[in-house]
């Protein structure tokens, strides 16, 4: 059985970062929240480029 991955969205990254900040967690560069935000930005760029949107 293969496992499908779901791309990180801006909304999901925002929820992760907000939750980490509220709980006193790490939101600095290199943290999971930071990496989630970066992945969401990359996915948003890839999606807009592949559909012709800007």
From Swiss-Prot:
Biased composition, class Low complexity, residue ranges: 28-54
Disordered, as annotated region: 1-54
Domain of life: Eukaryota
Name the UniProt record assigns to this protein: Putative uncharacterized protein DDB_G0289245
């Amino acid at each position: 059985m293969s496992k499908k991955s779901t791309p990180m969205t801006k909304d999901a990254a925002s929820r992760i970062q907000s939750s980490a900040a509220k709980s006193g967690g790490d939101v600095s560069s290199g943290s999971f929240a930071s990496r989630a935000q970066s992945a969401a930005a990359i996915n948003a760029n890839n999606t807009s480029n592949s559909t012709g949107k800007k």
